[in-house]
């Protein structure tokens, strides 16, 4: 099952631009904010700092290991890019690190299944500023200029996902089925705390219980798939 799932071809980028951006505006933009993704030279090699592997190193640097959770970004990207919504060509993903590095993720990017391989890829991304497909020159991930609002559709509705707000919106009610416009959802790629941004129009929650970033990603993509009839 997993082998078959992993071999499903991702959407074609050129077709997506023609079919979706020009004809169908029903696209979900997800921005993962505050993601922990920081490199340092540990044991003679550059590595993505992680609370599990580098707790002693971080304490020596007088940093809290609990703030270094790149696994959250890994889980979120797996949920987003593996989703039927992405395979249908109706998802765009950006993430911004706690160091204010903004990254554009291609819908065709295949996220490594293992965390170690993911970290290796992220070291390459932060040092070379892009990741290219092995067989082509296509960029699968690239560092782009801030602000993120320059990369989002003009006039789009931008909602910040937050548990600490009274408004509750079911994931399958985030947009009306007949609404022909893109939606931007901002999700904190953090383990604790609150994300504060200056480009959202509103704040909402999709559950009466606190959700992890990865579960939030899974629920919103599932909700939009239901709204837009993607099976």
Curated annotation (Swiss-Prot):
Q: Where in the cell is it found?
A: Nucleus, Nucleolus
Q: Which GO terms describe its biological process?
A: rRNA base methylation
Primary localisation category: nucleus
Enzyme nomenclature, EC number: 2.1.1.-
Which gene name belongs to this protein? emg-1
Q: Name one GO cellular component term.
A: nucleolus
Q: Where is this site: Interaction with substrate rRNA?
A: 69, 110, 113, 117
Q: Which reaction does it catalyse?
A: a pseudouridine in rRNA + S-adenosyl-L-methionine = an N(1)-methylpseudouridine in rRNA + S-adenosyl-L-homocysteine + H(+)
Q: What is this protein's name? A: Ribosomal RNA small subunit methyltransferase nep-1
Q: Which GO terms describe its molecular function?
A: rRNA (pseudouridine) methyltransferase activity; rRNA binding
Enzyme class (EC, first level): transferase
Question: Which residues, if any, are the signal sequence?
Answer: none
The entry assigns this protein to a family as follows: Belongs to the class IV-like SAM-binding methyltransferase superfamily. RNA methyltransferase NEP1 family.
């Amino acid at each position: 099952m997993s082998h078959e799932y992993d071999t499903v071809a991702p959407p074609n980028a050129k077709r997506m631009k023609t079919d979706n951006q020009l004809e169908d505006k029903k696209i979900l933009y997800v921005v993962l904010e505050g993601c922990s993704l920081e490199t340092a030279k540990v044991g003679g090699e550059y590595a993505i700092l992680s609370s599990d592997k580098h707790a002693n190193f971080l304490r020596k640097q007088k940093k809290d290991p609990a703030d270094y959770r790149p696994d959250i970004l890994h889980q979120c990207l797996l949920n987003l890019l593996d989703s039927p919504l992405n395979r249908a060509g109706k998802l765009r993903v950006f993430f911004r690190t706690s160091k204010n590095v903004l990254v554009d993720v291609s819908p065709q990017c295949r996220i490594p299944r293992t965390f170690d391989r993911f970290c290796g890829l992220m070291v390459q991304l932060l040092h070379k500023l892009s990741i290219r497909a092995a067989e082509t020159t296509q960029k699968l991930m690239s560092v782009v200029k801030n602000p993120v609002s320059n990369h989002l559709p003009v006039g789009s509705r931008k909602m910040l996902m937050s548990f600490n707000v009274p408004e509750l919106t079911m994931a399958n009610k985030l947009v009306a089925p007949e609404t022909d416009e893109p939606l931007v959802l901002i999700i904190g790629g953090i383990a604790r705390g609150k994300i504060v941004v200056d480009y959202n129009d509103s704040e909402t929650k999709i559950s009466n219980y606190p959700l992890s970033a990865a579960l939030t990603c899974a629920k919103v993509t599932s909700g939009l798939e239901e709204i837009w009839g993607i099976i």
